[in-house]
Amino acid sequence: MKLLKRTAFSLLGILLLILTIATILEKIYGTDFVNEYIYSSLPFVILWGVTAITSLLYIIKSKLHRQPVIFLLHLSLLFILAGAFTTWIYGEQGTMRVRQGEQQTSFTDSKGISHQLPFSITLNQFEIIYYKGTLAPMDFISHISVADKDCHRQIQGKVSMNHIFSYQHYRFYQSGYSEDNEGSVFSVSHDPYGIGITYAGYTLLLLSTVFFFFSPQSRFRQLLKSPLLHRSLTVILLLFAFSLNSNFLKANSPSPKVLPREVAEHFGDLYILYNNRICPLQTFARDFTIKLYGSSSYKGLTPEEVLTGWLFYYDSWKNEPIIRIKSNEARKLLEIEGNYARLKDYISTINEYKLEKMMNHIRSGEQVTDKRGIEEADEKFNIINLVCTGAMMKIFPCRNIAGKTLEWYSQSDQLPQDMDNDKWVFIRKSMSYVNEMIVMKKYNDACLLLEKIKKYQQKECDGLLPADNKFKAEKIYNQFDYSKSVAMACICIGLICFIYYCHCMASQKRTSRKAIIILNILLWIVFTYLSAAICLRGYVSNHLPLSNGFETMQFMAWCTLLLTFLLQRKFAMLLPFGFLLCGLTLMVSMLGESNPQITQLMPVLQSPLLSIHVVVIMIAYSLLAFIMLNGVTAVILHQSQKECKEQIERLQIISQIILYPAIFLLAIGIFIGAVWANVSWGRYWGWDPKEVWALITMLVYALALHPRSLPWFHRTMFFHVFCITAFITVLITYFGVNFLLGGMHSYANG
């Protein structure tokens, strides 16, 4: 019995170590290397098989079948492994390329081996569906015919993103298309048995999880009945400090020339094609200001004032230290002190571009110190030039002669030769007229000209522009630029709460009811702010805002507050957790990019399964973060000189209670993601670094759910230290993969 137990858990430990090493090797040697020598290798498969068999024998010896729900839960995992093994043996995956009008009867696997199909595929037509009024693709659709000689029949089918065509257990997925739009690339998967077994495992896992939480015999229900929970609970946070370098402008520094605010706002009210999306010009102005300065406001000026300042008062603005330079190497090349450069700092006294020599080295592939920082500084210089010449201001829509397609142009673009003369003159001259009115300070006339441009936009687009409500909603959302301030406020409030609750715990006093009411009011204010920001962003983008790192961290902060509201009645001292964790996640969301642009969603990301997958996993991460902070609190209390044994035990029970839904949500989230991946591109598991680290996280935390087999987890302090250490896997899963290891899930890779 002991030998089986030690063998099973030792093998699991070896698997975790191999998976960890594999993700590092993938970064060094590439995906093909680890797929061939680790993930698809026979020894790796045998190791999983031996681990599964040993675990099954241990489960039987432990007489776990006497607890049907727990037994089914473990059995579901074995089903999933059995499905993966079946896929490894019988499954076939490959790629098929077919031209329009051509017939194809085979596909090629990753090793270049051709596999014959028992039928033929003919591509009748390939089409790209675009988002309204833009050239951003919304979906790729292939219309196909299948000819089956054995059955003497021919059927019609359609393959598109998130829409599979299946025939005789062969599944076809739209994975690409030819450059001339005359051909399609299909991912082909033939897995007649593995998918069914795996999905049976997923279903069994979901059902057994639900039954577990409702079973009176489950350990989760027993923990809820613990007498320690019916006394005053104390849950406290440890705050780790964020060092924020703030740069303040001197109050007496002169402001550059700008338009009157109401005139600048008229500019912000125009439509623009930006980032393959029709949006308010205000959005472009905001992103432009953030790109240059790192904030949407400069010296109290609005983004519209900053943008129009560069457009109409270039000589004044080129002397402004508005360009944020993060790279020390770039600062040396520009010969500046401090973090901000002026545009004229880029040009030497002999009228040479200071970064030109270094950029030539970069373009030629030479090794350069801080290549990324220099490229970023160069990019900002080029963006200003493109804005000041009007090249980025695509504010003039124009239909072609047939009226079928809509193109957007800037004043400086090459216009079609067959364009109507009146349109040509309007596009070429209207902004010049606006400039003349501004030079003569005839601001009312300038506003009238801007209104004419907007009427031209509305007439030319005719039904393709965003709805008025959506347009206004985006302008309102652009005002929600206070995440950093909210984050700092939450951290400060959380710190005060932390000190206050520590004092109450040490002196055995009850927390003030007034303090709790005030904290709840503040929590509601932050929750309302976040809810409004997330809803507006989702409404404007036409999809759940969970498509990048910024959005998922904002959603995690929202989940944290929601969980605080739901749990604080049972665990009243969770209140500091809510503030601190919300503040930290909001601060993290601001680290990579102040606020990424709203973009059209890639076709493959339009599945509702993806949104559910991200939501469930973000909630799980929030719960695991609570547990980690709970553990930190326990360690602080343990190190104090006062007797806090009972409080530490309470913290352990709270963490154990939260741990069950956290792990089950993480497991369900992983497998929902697997179903989405199978629907989207034909494989439910691809050993992507984020998939691997999510699996590692789930398995590591699952160890803490086995105190009978691993008696160390009965020790209170061991449990808390384990939960703190285990949170490293969550950090690697999210940040390590996104910014270091890379992979298909990496937000940093776009």
Residue locations for each model-derived region?
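Solvent-exposed, non-transmembrane regions of integral membrane proteins
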Residues: M1-G750
